[in-house]
Curated annotation (Swiss-Prot):
UniProt-recorded name of the protein: Uncharacterized protein IMPP12
Tissue and organ distribution: Nacreous layer of shell.
Organism this protein belongs to: Nautilus macromphalus
Domain of life of the source: Eukaryota
Length: 10
């Protein structure tokens, strides 16, 4: 997983 997961979980 990458940093993109931060907004995904939002």
């Amino acid at each position: 997983l990458s940093v993109n997961y931060q907004w995904l979980v939002r």
